[in-house]
Each structure stands twice: as C-alpha cells, then as structure tokens.
C-alpha cells in the first residue's frame, strides 16, 4: 500500500478509531497514528509498520486487522497503530522519482547507486535507515557510512523527523508493549540487553506470539542497534517485539497476494495482546 492509498483508506475507518497526525516528513507527508482509545488513563499497545519502505505490506496487514474488527473486544488498554512510519520512503519505493521534486531526484539516484529502480529501497528520502536511527546503542554495528537505500544510521541519534516524531509519540502514549512489523522470515525478536527479570517477562510474551503465529524466536541482540524495538526495550524498559512477516522463500517486496496467508498466521493478535498485558501487569 502506498501513501495515497493509505490516506484514502483512512477516510473509511470505523468510528471507534481516531486518526492523529503525529509528525511530518521532509517532504511534508503525514506520519499517522490510528488510535482506539478505551480510556485516556489506560496504557497502550503500539504497532509500527512500514518503517522500511519496501516492507509496506505491513501497513496492509494492520488495516486488514482493523477492518476485520480483531480488536473490538479489547477493553483493558488502548491501541495505537503507526500505520506508515516512513511515508516518503514508501512513496519512493512504490512510485519512483516522480513523487519528488526535480531538485531532489538526482540526489536520490546517487544514493541508490546510480539506479532509478527503487523497488528494494528501505530508507527514508534522505537515505537514512530509520530503524537504525533510534537511541539504543546507535551506530555500534556494521552500517553504511553514507546516505543509501539501507543501513545508514544518520548523522546523529534522532536526526530524522520520522524517528523524532515516533519516539515523542511513543513516550506520550504510555505503552506497555510495542509490536514492530517487518518482512520477512517468520521470525520474532524480543531481546536487547534486558536485565534478567525483564528478560524472563519478555520471553514469556515472545513465546506466546511464537505459539500463535508459528514464527520462530531468534536472538539478534548482538547484531541489532538503533532500532525502534531496541529503543523501547532499552530506554522505556517495556516488552517490544519485532515480527518478520512472510516466508523467507518470498522475495522483497512481498506482494499483496500473500496478505491473506500472513493475516491468517497473525489473526490471534488480540488474545496475544491480552496475554502480554496480563504478564506486564503482574511483573510491575
């Protein structure tokens, strides 16, 4: 789903869902959170999708979940869906150079190694990999040294409008868990240098998600840094999961013909969240 399609979809949301603009990109596209607020005093489960441009089927999944009313019976906590964390990147990946000013197009081609094919692009329109730009051991692992299609951590922590807006909003919403959807591999990541007590708590939750989805838990702690999940674990000290959607046999970008099978494996999400909420509350 591209940015224009997203805006159109959001006009037809159920009345229980609110659309909030939490920030804007370099090229003035809206960073949008869709909220289901049960009670302002409650904590929140936050979902993040399309932080990597070529992984925009994750936006389709979130909206499919909302449209299928998977969350309608939740009454203990609020829900927030950051439905497209990287709208500039998604527009570039899906629509190409024409979606950007002429003055910027030459820079984009240069960042893309001279190619005008942006189908594999992950970064934002400044060539920063947003999922390497958060304040969690930032810049400590192998990464690109210059703006590019993927892997460039930025010039400093939170150098990008997107990561700044998302971090500010996340703290404001008092989350008890965050779920980041990526592609691909049908894997779950949850650990990032937690203390033993939090590690036990977070592993319980990860195992529940693994059981319901059939995904495999992987330990990528030593190879991860600067990610949204990493930041939530390290700085907010809450459970945070990354779910890699879609079989590893699929090719990037994953086409929408695979959406129904991805949805089927993730349709127990409301029950998983309720379990996570109970585990979190008991650990406090």
Stretch-by-stretch model annotation:
Residues 28, 130, 243:
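A residue-level signal for conserved active-site and pocket-lining positions in enzyme catalytic cores
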């Amino acid at each position: 789903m591209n940015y224009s399609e997203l805006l159109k979809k959001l006009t037809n949301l159920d009345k229980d869902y609110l659309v909030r603009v939490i920030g804007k990109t370099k090229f003035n596209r809206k960073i949008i959170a869709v909220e289901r607020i049960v009670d302002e005093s409650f904590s929140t489960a936050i979902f993040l999708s399309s932080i990597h441009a070529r992984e925009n089927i994750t936006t389709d999944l979130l909206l499919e979940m909302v449209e299928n009313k998977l969350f309608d019976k939740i009454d203990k906590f609020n829900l927030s869906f950051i439905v497209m964390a990287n709208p500039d990147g998604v527009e570039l990946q899906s629509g190409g150079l024409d979606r950007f000013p002429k003055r910027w197009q030459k820079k984009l081609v240069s960042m893309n190694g001279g190619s005008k094919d942006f189908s594999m692009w992950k970064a934002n329109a400044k060539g920063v990999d947003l999922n390497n730009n958060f304040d969690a051991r930032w810049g400590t692992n192998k990464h690109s040294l210059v703006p590019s299609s993927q892997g460039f951590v930025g010039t400093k922590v939170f150098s990008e409008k997107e990561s700044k807006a998302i971090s500010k909003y996340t703290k404001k919403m008092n989350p008890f868990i965050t779920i980041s959807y990526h592609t691909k591999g049908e894997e779950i990541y949850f650990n990032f240098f937690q203390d033993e007590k939090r590690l036990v708590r977070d592993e319980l939750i990860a195992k529940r998600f693994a059981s319901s989805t059939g995904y495999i838990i992987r330990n990528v702690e030593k190879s991860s840094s600067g990610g949204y999940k990493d930041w939530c674990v390290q700085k907010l000290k809450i459970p945070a999961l990354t779910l890699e959607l879609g079989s590893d046999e699929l090719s990037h970008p994953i086409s929408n013909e695979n959406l129904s099978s991805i949805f089927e494996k993730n349709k127990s999400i409301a029950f998983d969240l309720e379990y996570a909420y109970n585990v979190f509350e008991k650990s406090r």
